[in-house]
Amino acid sequence: MQKPIIEFRNVSKKFGNKTPISKVSFIVKKNNITTLIGPNGAGKTTIVRLMLGLEKPTSGEVIIDRKLKIGYVPQKFGLTTDIPITVKKFLDLLAPSHFNKNIKEISSFIDLEHIKKQEISKLSGGQFQKVVLACSIINNPDLIILDEPLQSLDVTSQQEFYQLIHFIRKKLNITVFMISHDLFTVIKNSDQVICLNGHICCSGVPHEITPNSEFSNALSSLGFYTHNHDHKH
C-alpha cells in the first residue's frame, strides 16, 4: 500500500477555550484530488494551517514528509487586481531564476499564452484564477492546497478550472487538496471527499454519496443536499 502524502492522526487543536477541531484523522493519497467540505467555522482553515506548519496540534500527529514541497493558494490571494503589470511579468517576478525556463511550459499548461501580455487588471475572474493556479505550481510542488478556488466563478469558469486541475494532476503528477462549498462539482471531480464540522462527519469516495446512505445523511445534516443530482463519477 502506498504511503499517504499527508496523514492526520487523532489531531485536536485548541485556541484558548475554543477547540476548532477535535480528534481528526484522515489521509491524503499521492496524486489524488482530495476535497474538504464543511460549513463556516467547521475548522477547515485550521486544517490548512496545520498542513502548512503554521500551527502545531494540541494533541495528535500531523505526519508530513519534510521534503514535501507545497504550493498554496489562499481564499483571498492578496493580489490587487489594479496593479499595472502584465501576466508574464508577474509570473517572472514570482519564479526564481532557475525556474524561469518553466514559465512558458506552465503558461501553456494553464492556457495563459493568449493573455500573458494583458495586465492583471484586465482579466476576468476565470482568467485571474488561472494566474493564481500558475502561481501555485510555478516551483514544481508535490502538493497544491487550494482554498475555495471556485468562489465567485461562473459555471463555465468552474468547469474550465477543474479541467485544468485534472490536466495538471496527470501531467505534473501533483497531489491536490482543495476546500470547497460546492458539493455538486466536488462529487464530479474528487477522488476523496472529507466532510468536517469540528470533527470528521464522514469521509469516502464520491460514489458512496448515494441517497439515504450514511455519507449522504451526514452531508444533508450540514446543509449539503445530495438527492437532486446525478453523482456518477
Swiss-Prot record:
Record-listed ATP binding positions: G38, P39, N40, G41, A42, G43, K44, T45
Any Pfam family matching the protein: ABC_tran
GO biological process per UniProt: response to zinc ion
Keywords annotated in UniProt: ATP-binding, Cell inner membrane, Cell membrane, Ion transport, Membrane, Nucleotide-binding, Translocase, Transport, Zinc, Zinc transport
Highest taxon, organism lineage: Bacteria
Enzyme class: translocase
InterPro entries the record matches: AAA+_ATPase, ABC_transporter-like_ATP-bd, ABC_transporter-like_CS, Metal_Ion_Import_ABC, P-loop_NTPase
Compartments it resides in: Cell inner membrane
This protein's record includes keyword Membrane: yes
SMART domains found in the cross-reference section: AAA
EC number(s) per entry: 7.2.2.20
Chief location category: membrane
Membrane found in the keyword field: yes
Domain ABC transporter: 6-222
Membrane topology: Peripheral membrane protein
GO CC annotations, alphabetized: plasma membrane
Catalytic function, reaction form: Zn(2+)(out) + ATP(in) + H2O(in) = Zn(2+)(in) + ADP(in) + phosphate(in) + H(+)(in)
Family to which this protein belongs: Belongs to the ABC transporter superfamily. Zinc importer (TC 3.A.1.15.5) family.
Function recorded in the entry: Part of the ABC transporter complex ZnuABC involved in zinc import. Responsible for energy coupling to the transport system.
Record-given protein name: Zinc import ATP-binding protein ZnuC
Organism of provenance: Rickettsia prowazekii (strain Madrid E)
The encoding gene: znuC
